[in-house]
């Protein structure tokens, strides 16, 4: 299963699993460890290529059998299962070590689902209208479920809720290009300050993807997640 209507994704790509867990470790996000005998609060202390280490101060003397680890981060709930954990010492702290999970269940919160693209990133949506005329619109924001398109100036008369973009090409630069069908759901008036602190008004077209295959859903979600990780890293520099 790749996605359902609740924003659930199963992350099985090794680089994604490592990237998510390393970010959780870096942010020191609390986690809960649960098995048949006990449950306790913990922190990820280390994420290696093949194993993870989490604090075990609140654990019993043994952590027997398979465990489920639950992490409630600011933008998602993450769950995964690990095998037998072994007690160890990590920089003077009682800890548990186990193998890197093969997959993560990643439930993205709707309020964080959409990523706004900075103005200096030229992410574009292009294609042809039914009459053969071409269009090229800037992608204002994106998610695994759709995109927000930006229109500066008057709206073309044909762009009304219910309009369908057929075979639209989403160009996300180094994050990939995707050809999709989309439906225009709603049009909102929006504004922002430009580099000279002048107010700029524009129209935002909220579009949803139509009948994406599982493979395409996965590719778009991976691109969104990779862009969000890179953008957050740059903001922290």
From Swiss-Prot:
Give GO BP annotations, semicolon-separated. Answer: bacterial-type flagellum-dependent cell motility; regulation of bacterial-type flagellum-dependent cell motility by regulation of motor speed
Localisation: Bacterial flagellum basal body
The record places domain PilZ at 108-225
Its cellular-component GO annotations read:
bacterial-type flagellum basal body
What InterPro entries would the database entry show? PilZ_domain, Split_barrel_FMN-bd, T3SS_YcgR, T3SS_YcgR_PilZN
Domain of life the protein comes from: Bacteria
Q: Which UniProt keywords apply?
A: Bacterial flagellum, c-di-GMP, Nucleotide-binding
Checking Gene3D superfamilies in the record gives: Electron Transport, Fmn-binding Protein, Chain A, predicted glycosyltransferase like domains
Q: Kindly name one Pfam family recorded for this protein.
A: PilZ
Entry GO MF terms: cyclic-di-GMP binding
Q: What does this protein do?
A: Acts as a flagellar brake, regulating swimming and swarming in a bis-(3'-5') cyclic diguanylic acid (c-di-GMP)-dependent manner. Binds 1 c-di-GMP dimer per subunit. Increasing levels of c-di-GMP lead to decreased motility.
- Name the protein family: Belongs to the YcgR family.
This protein's assembly is summarised as: Monomer. Interacts with the flagellar basal bodies.
Q: What is this protein called?
A: Flagellar brake protein YcgR
Species for this entry: Serratia proteamaculans (strain 568)
């Amino acid at each position: 299963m790749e996605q359902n209507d609740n924003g659930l994704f199963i992350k099985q790509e090794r680089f994604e699993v490592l990237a998510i867990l390393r970010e959780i470790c870096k942010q020191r996000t609390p986690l809960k460890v649960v098995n048949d005998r006990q449950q306790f609060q913990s922190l990820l202390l280390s994420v290696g290529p093949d194993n993870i280490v989490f604090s075990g101060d609140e654990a019993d003397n043994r952590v027997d059998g398979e465990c489920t680890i639950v992490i409630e981060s600011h933008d998602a709930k993450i769950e995964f299962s690990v095998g037998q954990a072994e007690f160890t010492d990590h920089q003077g702290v009682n800890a548990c070590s186990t193998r890197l999970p093969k997959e993560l269940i990643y439930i993205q919160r709707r309020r964080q689902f959409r990523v706004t693209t900075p103005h200096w990133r030229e992410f574009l949506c292009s294609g042809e209208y039914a009459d053969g005329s071409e269009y090229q619109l800037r992608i204002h924001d994106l998610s695994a479920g759709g995109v927000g398109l930006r229109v500066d100036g008057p709206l073309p008369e044909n762009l009304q809720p219910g309009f369908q973009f057929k075979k639209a090409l989403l160009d996300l630069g180094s994050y990939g290009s995707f050809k999709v069908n989309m439906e225009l759901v709603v049009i909102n008036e929006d504004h922002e300050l430009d580099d000279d602190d002048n107010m700029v008004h524009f129209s935002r077209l909220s579009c949803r993807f139509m009948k994406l295959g599982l493979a395409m859903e996965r590719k778009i979600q991976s691109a969104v997640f990779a862009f969000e990780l890179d953008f957050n890293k740059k903001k922290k520099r």
